[in-house]
Amino acid sequence: MAFLKLTEQNVQGKTVLIRADMNVPFKDGKISDDTRIRASIASVKYCVDNGASVIVMTHLGRPTEGEFHPEDDVAPVAAHLGSLLGKDVKVLNDWRENKPALNAGDVVMLQNVRINKGEKKNDLELGKAYASLCDVFVNDAFGTAHRAQASTEAVAQAAPVACAGVLMAGELDALGKALKQPARPMVAIVAGSKVSTKLTILESLADKVDQLIVGGGIANTFLLAEGKAIGKSLAEHDLVEESKKIMAKMAAKGGSVPLPTDVVVAKAFAADAEAVVKDIADVAEDDMILDIGPKSAAALADLLKAADTVVWNGPVGVFEFDQFAGGTKALAEAIAQSKAFSIAGGGDTLAAIAKFGVTEQIGYISTGGGAFLEFLEGKELPAVAALEKRGA
C-alpha cells in the first residue's frame, strides 16, 4: 500500500486537520472509557511538537444530520483531550462562518462531524469546506475507514496534502504485513456465533492461510458438515454446504480446517451451568457445545506455536463464563508464546486478550472493528483508497 504518512511530513508553521475516531462511550454523562482518545494522541502530539497548529475532528454517537442536541456535543471529548495534552482545547461550532486563526501549538476541535448535512453522503462541498481549514489533512480514524464520508473521503480528495496518521499507518502496516506478504505458515482463527456474518472472511482467508481454525457457533456448523452430532448447539444448517466448500478449498491446497475432537458441553447457556468435557462422538441430543475441549485446545495451540503469522478474530468458546473459557485462554497463551507476528481484532477478541493478560504479547491489536473485518474480507476501504490515490 502506497500512502503518505504524517511522520514523513514537515508540518512546521502549518495547520493540520486530523480526522480522529474519538467516539467514546459515556455513562452518567461522563466518559467511561477513553481508549480511543488516548489512541489518537500520538498524531496530535507529533504535530504540536513539530510546530503545527492542530484542528481535530471526530464523530460522536449517531446524531441526526442538521440537528444538534446536547448529547451530541463533543465538548467533554475536547476537555478530556485537553487534560491529557495539558492544553485548553476549544470546540469550534461556527467554523464555516469564521475560519479559526490559530498559532503554532494550538489545538482546537470541530463540533461533531455527524451533525453536518452531507457528512454521511460523502458530500464533496462539505469535504472542500473541511479541506479549506488546513494545509495538511491527516486521517487517523481507521475505525471509520470502511465508510466513504465527507470527513474521511471527500476531504482527502480536496486537501492540499492527505496522509495517514500514526494510528492509521500502524494499522495499515500491520494488516499489510499479516495479509499482503505473510510469513508462513500462516494460521487464522475465525470464530463467532454465525457463519453467515463471517462467510466472506472465511472464503477470503481460505485463499490465503495454511490452517483455518474456526470456533464458536461457526465450528458447530463445520462439525455438522463433517456429519458430527452437535446436540442443541447453535449452528446454521443452511450453510453446511458452504462450510463443506471451504473445507474442500483448504484441503485442495494442502491445508485444513482443524475441528475439535473433544468439547465442553452444558445442558443450558448460563453462568452457573455445569461444564462437562466429552469426545465429539459422545455429544448428547440435549447438550450445548460451549467451548473446545483440552485435547483440541492443546492440538490447536501447537499449530499456533509453529506459525509465523497469526490472524485472530473471535473467541472459540463462551469465555465470559470461566468454565467455558479454557479453549480461548489456551489459544491466547499459545499466540503469546508463539514467535509469529500476530494481529487481533474485534470487540470480543480484545476483551479476551485483556481477560487473559496477553495484551503485550500480541504483535498488533487492531482498533478497527468493522474496518478490520472488511480488510480481512479483502474489500477496499474507501478512506484508505483515498489516501492511496493522493499518495500515488
Swiss-Prot record:
It catalyses: (2R)-3-phosphoglycerate + ATP = (2R)-3-phospho-glyceroyl phosphate + ADP. ATP binds at residues 198, 320, 346-349. Pathway: Carbohydrate degradation; glycolysis; pyruvate from D-glyceraldehyde 3-phosphate: step 2/5. GO terms for molecular function: ADP binding; ATP binding; phosphoglycerate kinase activity. Its EC number is 2.7.2.3. SUPFAM superfamilies: Phosphoglycerate kinase (SSF53748). GO terms for biological process: gluconeogenesis; glycolytic process. Keywords: ATP-binding, Cytoplasm, Glycolysis, Kinase, Nucleotide-binding, Transferase. Pfam families: PGK. Substrate binds at residues 21-23, 36, 59-62, 114, 147. GO terms for cellular component: cytosol. InterPro entries: Phosphoglycerate_kinase, Phosphoglycerate_kinase_CS, Phosphoglycerate_kinase_N, Phosphoglycerate_kinase_sf. It is found in: Cytoplasm. Belongs to the phosphoglycerate kinase family. Monomer. HAMAP family: Phosphoglyc_kinase (MF_00145). This is Phosphoglycerate kinase. It comes from Neisseria meningitidis serogroup A / serotype 4A (strain DSM 15465 / Z2491). The lineage of its organism: Bacteria, Pseudomonadati, Pseudomonadota, Betaproteobacteria, Neisseriales. The gene is pgk.
